[in-house]
């Protein structure tokens, strides 16, 4: 079960989330609905660790997610999947993953290899398609 209590997230002086609370029960579908700028994406990014909460609680399977790295949250079973399908169509799946890892890694050779292995561990389907051109992936596969 995912439980969010009194969640506050701010961007400078702008309070994007102001005391949001809800519970998403296991086996149930929960939706987040709101107008543009209402904070839906901020909520999802905060739950997945991509934004820091100023205050409040987020628990998943009775464990706190507050302050955890996004990678740790993904390993626990929660991932933020952006709406876009941004891939470089002319490159292979493996080359796209390598390009994506360049933006977050410091020690190029070993860290890139590790990043690719982590992605394949999370998404074995991409490992099967590693040599395939990324432009031939389905929409869902591109979001992996």
Regions found by a protein language model. Name each.
Residues 56-65, 76, 110-116:
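Conserved ABC transporter NBD signature motif
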Residues 30-31, 80:
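Short beta-strand immediately N-terminal to the Walker A/P-loop
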Residues 48:
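Helix-to-loop junction immediately C-terminal to a conserved catalytic motif
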Residues 33-35:
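The feature captures the beta-strand-to-loop junction immediately N-terminal to the Walker
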Residues 12, 30, 68, 93-114, ...:
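ABC-type ATPase nucleotide-binding domains, specifically the catalytic core motifs of the NBD
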Residues 133-137:
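Conserved ABC ATPase signature
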């Amino acid at each position: 079960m995912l439980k969010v209590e009194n969640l506050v997230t701010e961007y400078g002086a702008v309070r994007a989330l102001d005391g949001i609370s809800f519970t998403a029960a296991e086996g149930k579908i929960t939706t987040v609905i709101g107008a543009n700028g209402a904070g839906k994406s901020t909520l999802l990014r905060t739950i997945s660790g991509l934004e820091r909460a100023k205050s409040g609680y987020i628990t998943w399977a009775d464990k706190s997610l507050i302050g955890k790295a996004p990678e740790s949250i993904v390993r626990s079973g929660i991932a933020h999947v952006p709406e876009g399908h941004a891939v470089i169509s002319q490159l292979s799946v493996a080359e796209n993953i390598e390009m994506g890892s360049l933006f977050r890694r410091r020690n190029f050779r070993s860290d890139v290899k590790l990043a690719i292995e982590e992605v394949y561990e999370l998404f074995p389907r991409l490992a099967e398609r590693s040599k395939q051109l990324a432009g031939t992936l389905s929409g869902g596969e591109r979001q992996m």
